[in-house]
Amino acid sequence: MTDAPNLKGFDARLREEAAEEPTLEIPEQPPTKKTQIIAIYGKGGSGKSFTLANLSHMMAEMGKRVLLIGCDPKSDTTSLLFGGKNCPTIIETATKKKLAGEEVKVGDVCFKSGGVFAMELGGPEVGRGCGGRGIIHGFELLEKLGFHDWDFDFVLLDFLGDVVCGGFGLPIARDMAQKVIVIGSNDLQSLYVANNVCNAVEYFRKLGGNVGVAGIVINKDDGTGEAQAFAREVGIPILAAIPADEELRRKSAAYQIVGSHATPWGKLFEELAGNVADAPPLRPRPLSPDALLALFETDEETRVVDLVPATDEDLRGSNAAPKKSLEVIYDDV
C-alpha cells in the first residue's frame, strides 16, 4: 500500500510557482546567421504533428538544415519521424540527470531521422505542475545546451493553441519567433483557436512586438470553404490545403512519412515548404466572435436568440418556496 500524497500547502505552493517571473533571457545582440524560427499553433487534433513532421522531412530533402521541437505536453510531435517511437523529453531527461548528479547532453535529447533533427520539450505529469512553466523551463535548458549557437536554416516549434497561458505564448510575447503559422480545418473549433492566436499576435504588435502571422495551413480540407473564408477575412495567405484523403489518414495512423518526393504528395509538401520559407509575417485582422460564427451561416434564415436573464427563483428550483419572515410585529397598543 502506497502512502497518500501530502497535499498540505499544495495550493499555496502552486500560487507561489505561478507568481514567479520567468528567468529566460533572450540575447539582445544581433543574430550571426539567418535562421527562421517559426512557431506553429493549432487546436489539438488539427494535424499539427502530421503537418510539421512531413514539412520538416521535405525541407531536409530539399537540402535545408531543420530542427523540429515539440512544445506540446503530449510530446508526440516528432513520433511520426521515428515510426511511432517517442523521444525522451528534455524536461524528463533533465529531472533524471539532476537526481543522478549528471549534466544533460545534446545526445540525450536530440535525435536524427531523414535529415531532420528533432526533440521534445515535454511537460509535467497530469495534475502536477504547470504546462506553460514547463515550456519556459524547457527553453531555459535549451539555452544551456547552446541553442543560439546552433546552425539551422529552420527551427519549427509545435505549440498547442488551445491553451492561452503565457508559457505557450512565449514565442509571440518575447519575439522568439519571426513568424507564426496556424493550422486549421473547416470547423468552428479549429478556426476559433486560429483566431485566438491571431488575437494574441495583434495584442503584442500593439505593444511593440514584431511577430506576425505568415499564413494558415488548411488540413483535412473537405472543400466547404470556411477556412478559406477565414483566411480572407483575417488577411493571411493560405500556405497549403491538405485534402481530407483516406489514404493520407491511413499513412498518418501507420506513422508513415508522406512529405517526400517519393510519394504522390511530395509536390504538395514541396510547395508548402517554399511558401513557409518565403511568406512574410503579417499583421492579422482577428475576427469578433459574431464575425467568426458568420462564416458558418447557411442560406437559411438566421436564427435570432435572445438572452433571457435567470432569476434567483430559477436557480433555487424546488427550494424557491418563500421563507417565513423573522420580523417581529407588535400589536397596536
UniProtKB/Swiss-Prot annotation:
Pfam families: Fer4_NifH. Mg(2+) binds at residue 49. Residues 1-22 are annotated as: Disordered. Its cofactor is [4Fe-4S] cluster. GO terms for molecular function: 4 iron, 4 sulfur cluster binding; ATP binding; metal ion binding; oxidoreductase activity, acting on the CH-CH group of donors, NAD or NADP as acceptor. It catalyses: 3-deacetyl-3-vinylbacteriochlorophyllide a + 2 oxidized [2Fe-2S]-[ferredoxin] + ADP + phosphate = chlorophyllide a + 2 reduced [2Fe-2S]-[ferredoxin] + ATP + H2O + H(+); bacteriochlorophyllide a + 2 oxidized [2Fe-2S]-[ferredoxin] + ADP + phosphate = 3-acetyl-3-devinylchlorophyllide a + 2 reduced [2Fe-2S]-[ferredoxin] + ATP + H2O + H(+); 3-deacetyl-3-(1-hydroxyethyl)bacteriochlorophyllide a + 2 oxidized [2Fe-2S]-[ferredoxin] + ADP + phosphate = 3-devinyl-3-(1-hydroxyethyl)chlorophyllide a + 2 reduced [2Fe-2S]-[ferredoxin] + ATP + H2O + H(+). Homodimer. Chlorophyllide reductase is composed of three subunits; BchX, BchY and BchZ. This is Chlorophyllide reductase 35.5 kDa chain. It comes from Rhodobacter capsulatus (strain ATCC BAA-309 / NBRC 16581 / SB1003).
